[in-house]
């Protein structure tokens, strides 16, 4: 960013200000240290400060650049301090022949050192000396500080020589962090460079894990103080979760570990993609803009975005009201989205550090020792003691004497609810070589490990400690292979090992009843499988353990489970169950999200795979944990509804409750049931309506929805409207249903999905029906955006209006798509190999076309349009998004209702779809589908 971009000359003209002070000094009769001269100098600097701040605020209001404003204010302060220090050393307290001891460097540290300030930010200064302070130096420091304080600035300061800086940085993490941000301002630059070199060599080198763990622990403590959630309605912009300090922490740890000076260097190192760097800069800019506006608006260092100032800040940032949402709500929504982005960046960077084994030295809460120094034995042999609520080793050789103690340490910590003493962990780390084949096969060690894994307390916490220490990967080498393994895509938020630990945490929460509202079925089922609960914990630990191998990780993982389970002490029957669960851990998610659950063949095929109710229960809970632990925002109510539907439908088959009535008999029953619900209609009108839908409609749509559709169509007919839409929010499922009644034509679904995309609707499912009088009744499900049904209904009605306008010709779809949809820029960093499969075995009635490719705006509209152009009728569409990747399934027939069985025609369909997806030469068309969870 150049000075021209910053327009620094509009903030303060350094030469003009310096010349003005020198002219005042040259013409003054008083001593430079006199009170009158001091007042003149002070007023000149205060005027420059006020003018510069006013200019910075004006520029912020015009260009909106938060980072620009922070840099401008920093430049203003740099200029004033430089000129003041020069005046102090050359005019107020000049030295004719300064000795080496009187050299001094003025250094910006802390937040000021990072090069960005809000109006009320603290100014942290280090007066750096070569040796001890001199009388002359004391005068300069005192003059400079008092002038800055009298200018109304909050100045934090220290006066130290280099040896003192190094010693204190070694002892105090806060001082170390402040020096990490050190930036030369004025004075002796060689002195500052010496500090930089010694800090790098004597402090940074070799202490990366210690620093990173301390910063992350500090962040966690700060979150607990400010509020765990980033969605606090009155967030602290500086200290809250997802706020500025989180961004600072990210840069601190990467700067410390990778020895970089700028965020841009992280791209070259592969830590951040260019899209992620842009996201980082965008979040930083927004948070700076909010914080700078808050300081300007309140005339103080206000960091809490409270209710009373939210309206003014929203106005300053230029937000305006939209239908159903006022300008403050739009601003706060933007704030929360940025806070979420900061959380995403935290995961990205922490995962990259884990991948580089930056955290191989475990860190734990270092609690100040209490007055009590009592120790008590924790084991019969006296190997472990409890010391101030931390488990420690009683002797330095206990791991060498009995390597099982390396597992027993964690077992006892879990049983007694203890943290870990650093001494114990250091000894453990030095003893990792003792974990060998003999220990891995030791029955007692495996018994203890299984009890840790299946603990009724908080197994994730202890397993995380085992992982951080290196014990888990050594004890289970297959787990060690996936520690810090990154999956380079936009779907998975965590390393594989982190994902597995989070899965176990979710299961523990379900078992403790903490998620009964969000996951009612899992909450109920967990109480019915007490005998098999251990199998779920083992499965969750192992289900992704084969990631990163050339073969399907589910199959390879099942093979690993078959080998490990007997070692853990599981019976042959239990081992068989875990092996099956690992092999099929993606199946339920895949079927629920990408298959038509109203198609009987889907349910029967899935029941054939599951075979027993016990397996069905275990697989449902496993799937919930797996999806929920992928990352924030991945789980939603719609996925929960799909899984519950699949569970209940399969339960009927497995328990013998599934109807074996013929299709015709079920159609007859459904029509009679609807006729009964419409008994208040005139018979002639009722009979005419019952003749409209085809059999497939009655066999797949619930009776309540059939009644709702009947009144919907009746009202449209009475009003003489050929084209009409209806919206219905589903809060628990987190989707909103939009029903469209329109004259049928081949590209209707393409137009509807395109209109949804243009209106900002994210489609997750679509059901298409035609009536005997040539109309289409299409039901589209879009992701929910608002908390309240009223807000969501208004939003859905706006989407419906766009659909009506496009279908009626009032709006031109291509123009709307061009205006309203933007590519996901982050997705450009990824490649998804296009895939098309055509399958005639998944449904008795329909051909299933499954496509996979890189997501882009309007893709669903393009796909459905092409399928229609290929003379195919779409009965249903099932849309699944995994970050940058989409997997869409379409249930189709030809125009006379038959499956697509001709090989030549299938080949043509594949080629056309692959071309649309961007494949070269009609590339890959077969292969196992990459599926939903983890």
From Swiss-Prot:
Q: Where is each ACT domain found?
A: 737-818, 848-931
What's the catalysed reaction?
Answer: [protein-PII]-L-tyrosine + UTP = [protein-PII]-uridylyl-L-tyrosine + diphosphate; [protein-PII]-uridylyl-L-tyrosine + H2O = [protein-PII]-L-tyrosine + UMP + H(+)
**What SMART domains does the entry give?**
HDc (SM00471)
| Entry's EC annotation | 2.7.7.59, 3.1.4.-
Every HD domain range: 496-613
The way its activity is modulated is described as:
Uridylyltransferase (UTase) activity is inhibited by glutamine, while glutamine activates uridylyl-removing (UR) activity.
A GO term, aspect molecular function? [protein-PII] uridylyltransferase activity
Lineage: superkingdom = Bacteria
What's in the keyword line of the UniProt record?
Answer: Hydrolase, Magnesium, Multifunctional enzyme, Nucleotidyltransferase, Repeat, Transferase
Outline the segment boundaries, as ranges, of region: Uridylyl-removing: 380-736
Q: Name one GO biological process term.
A: regulation of nitrogen utilization
**CDD domains according to UniProt:** ACT_ACR-UUR-like_2, ACT_UUR-like_1, HDc, NT_GlnE_GlnD_like
Required co-factors: Mg(2+)
Region of interest called Uridylyltransferase, as start-end residue ranges on this chain: 1-379
Q: Which Pfam families does the annotation name?
A: ACT, GlnD_UR_UTase, HD
Domain comment, as recorded: Has four distinct domains: an N-terminal nucleotidyltransferase (NT) domain responsible for UTase activity, a central HD domain that encodes UR activity, and two C-terminal ACT domains that seem to have a role in glutamine sensing.
Described function: Modifies, by uridylylation and deuridylylation, the PII regulatory proteins (GlnB and homologs), in response to the nitrogen status of the cell that GlnD senses through the glutamine level. Under low glutamine levels, catalyzes the conversion of the PII proteins and UTP to PII-UMP and PPi, while under higher glutamine levels, GlnD hydrolyzes PII-UMP to PII and UMP (deuridylylation). Thus, controls uridylylation state and activity of the PII proteins, and plays an important role in the regulation of nitrogen assimilation and metabolism.
Query: Which protein family is it in?
Result: Belongs to the GlnD family.
Q: Know the name of this protein? A: Bifunctional uridylyltransferase/uridylyl-removing enzyme
Origin organism of this chain? Brucella suis (strain ATCC 23445 / NCTC 10510)
């Amino acid at each position: 960013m150049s000075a021209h971009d910053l327009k620094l000359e509009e903030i303060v003209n350094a030469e003009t200000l310096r010349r003005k002070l020198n002219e005042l000094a040259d013409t003054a009769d008083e001593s430079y240290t006199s009170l009158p001269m001091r007042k003149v100098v002070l007023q000149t600097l205060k005027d420059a400060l006020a003018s510069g701040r006013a200019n910075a605020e004006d520029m912020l209001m015009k260009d909106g650049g938060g980072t620009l404003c922070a840099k401008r204010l920093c430049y203003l302060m740099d200029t004033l301090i430089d000129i003041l220090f020069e005046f102090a050393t050359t005019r107020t307290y000049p030295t004719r022949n300064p000795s080496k001891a009187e050299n001094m460097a003025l250094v910006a540290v802390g937040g000021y050192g990072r090069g960005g300030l809000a109006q009320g930010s603290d100014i942290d200064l280090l007066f750096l000396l070569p040796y001890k302070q001199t009388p002359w130096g004391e005068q300069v420091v005192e003059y400079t500080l008092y002038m800055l304080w009298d200018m109304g600035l909050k100045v934090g300061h220290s006066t130290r020589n280099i040896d003192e800086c190094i010693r204190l940085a070694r002892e105090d993490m806060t001082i170390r962090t402040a020096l990490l941000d050190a930036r030369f301002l004025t004075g002796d630059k060689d002195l500052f460079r010496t500090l930089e070199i010694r800090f790098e060599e004597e402090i940074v080198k070799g202490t990366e894990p210690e620093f990173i763990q301390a910063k992350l622990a500090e962040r966690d403590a700060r979150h607990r103080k400010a509020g765990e959630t980033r969605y606090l309605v009155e967030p602290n912009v500086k200290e809250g979760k997802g706020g500025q300090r989180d961004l600072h922490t990210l840069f601190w740890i990467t700067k410390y570990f990778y020895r970089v000076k700028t965020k841009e260097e992280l791209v070259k190192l592969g830590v951040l993609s260019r899209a992620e760097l842009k996201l980082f800069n965008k979040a930083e800019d927004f948070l700076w803009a909010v914080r700078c506006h808050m300081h300007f608006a309140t005339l103080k260092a206000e960091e809490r975005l409270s209710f009373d100032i939210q309206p003014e800040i929203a106005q300053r940032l230029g937000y305006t009201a939209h239908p159903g949402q006022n300008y403050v709500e739009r601003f706060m929504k933007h704030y929360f989205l940025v806070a979420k982005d900061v959380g995403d960046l935290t995961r990205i960077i922490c995962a990259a550090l884990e991948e580089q084994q930056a955290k191989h030295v475990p860190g734990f809460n270092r609690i100040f020792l209490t007055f009590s120094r009592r120790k008590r034995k924790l084991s019969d042999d006296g190997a472990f003691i409890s010391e101030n609520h931390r488990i420690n080793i009683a002797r330095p050789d206990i791991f060498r004497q009995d390597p099982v103690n390396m597992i027993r340490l964690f077992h006892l910590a879990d049983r007694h609810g203890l943290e870990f003493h650093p001494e114990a962990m250091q000894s453990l780390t030095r003893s990792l070589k003792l974990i060998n084949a003999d220990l891995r096969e030791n029955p007692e060690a495996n018994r203890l490990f299984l009890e840790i894994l299946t603990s009724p307390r908080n197994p994730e916490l202890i397993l995380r400690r085992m992982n951080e220490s290196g014990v888990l990967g050594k004890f289970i080498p297959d787990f060690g292979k996936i520690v810090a393994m990154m999956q380079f895509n936009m779907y998975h938020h965590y390393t594989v090992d982190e994902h597995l630990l989070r899965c176990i945490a979710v299961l523990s929460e379900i078992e403790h009843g903490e998620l009964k509202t969000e996951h009612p079925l899992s909450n109920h089922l967990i109480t019915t499988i007490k005998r098999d609960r251990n199998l779920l914990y083992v499965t969750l630990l192992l289900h992704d353990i084969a990631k990163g191998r050339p073969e399907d990780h589910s199959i390879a993982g099942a093979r690993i489970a078959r080998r490990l389970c007997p070692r853990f002490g599981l019976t042959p029957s239990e081992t068989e169950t875990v092996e099956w669960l690992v092999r099929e851990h993606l199946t339920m998610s895949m079927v629920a999200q990408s298959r038509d659950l109203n198609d009987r063949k889907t349910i029967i095929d899935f029941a054939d795979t599951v075979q027993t109710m016990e397996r069905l229960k275990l697989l449902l809970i496993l799937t919930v944990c797996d999806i929920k632990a992928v990352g924030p925002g991945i789980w939603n109510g719609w996925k929960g509804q799909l899984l519950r539907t699949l569970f209940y439908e399969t339960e009927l088959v497995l328990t013998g409750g599934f109807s074996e009535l013929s299709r015709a008999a079920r159609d007859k029953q459904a029509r009679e049931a609807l006729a009964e619900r419409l008994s208040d209609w005139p018979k002639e009108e009722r009979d005419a309506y019952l003749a409209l839908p085809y059999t497939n409609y009655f066999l797949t749509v619930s009776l309540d929805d059939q009644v709702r559709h009947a009144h919907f169509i009746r009202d449209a007919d009475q009003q003489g409207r050929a084209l009409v839409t209806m919206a219905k929010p589903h809060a628990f499922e987190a989707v909103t249903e939009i029903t469209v009644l329109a004259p049928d034509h081949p590209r209707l679904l393409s137009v509807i999905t395109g209109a949804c995309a243009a209106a900002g609707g994210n489609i997750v499912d679509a059901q298409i029906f035609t009536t005997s009088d040539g109309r289409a009744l299409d039901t589209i499900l879009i992701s929910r955006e608002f908390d309240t049904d009223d807000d969501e209904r208004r939003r859905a009605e706006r989407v419906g209006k766009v659909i009506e306008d496009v279908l009626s010709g009032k709006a031109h779809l291509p123009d709307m798509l061009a205006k309203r949809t933007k590519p996901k820029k982050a997705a450009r960093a990824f490649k998804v190999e296009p895939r098309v499969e055509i399958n005639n075995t998944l449904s008795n009635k329909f051909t299933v076309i499954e496509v996979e490719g890189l997501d882009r705006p309007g893709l669903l509209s393009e796909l459905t349009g092409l399928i229609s152009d290929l003379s195919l009728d779409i009965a249903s569409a099932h849309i699944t998004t995994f970050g940058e990747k989409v997997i869409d399934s379409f249930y189709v027939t030809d125009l006379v209702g038959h499956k697509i069985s001709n090989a030549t025609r299938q080949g043509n369909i594949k080629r056309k779809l692959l071309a649309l997806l961007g494949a070269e030469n009609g590339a890959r068309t077969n292969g196992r589908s990459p599926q939903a969870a983890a």
